[in-house]
Amino acid sequence: MLELGCGLGLPALAAALRGADVLATDWAVEAIALLRRNAEHNGVFLRVARVRWSEPEPLLRAAPWDLVLGADLLYEARNAEQLAELLPRLAPRSVEPTRGRGEVLLAEPGRPYAKEFLERFRAEPVGERIFRLAC
């Protein structure tokens, strides 16, 4: 499981506690440091990495991901643009049953870019299959 823009990493911590193999990522050094301390304090093992969506090679090397999570990521236009290009590459829907579902789950508080982002995905043939947005 991959969490993008993890911040404090609550979804990543919860998934790791349930036994998932987790990589939690963020651009902010402070967020990464806090998540590492929180995981250590709670005895949770997960991988943590500082990643820019404009330089996604480390994430793509580990793709395809069965599940990609994110929350409140679409607060800037550039985030929406970068994610629109990146998400289908991170979690492609495989035709092989053993390759995973390639599911993307995003929770957004209703920011303006979220609507445009969802419309872009709905316009693409694979959009509805790989993407769900909860506002």
Question: Predicted segment positions?
Answer:
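S-adenosylmethionine-dependent methyltransferases
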Residues: 1-135
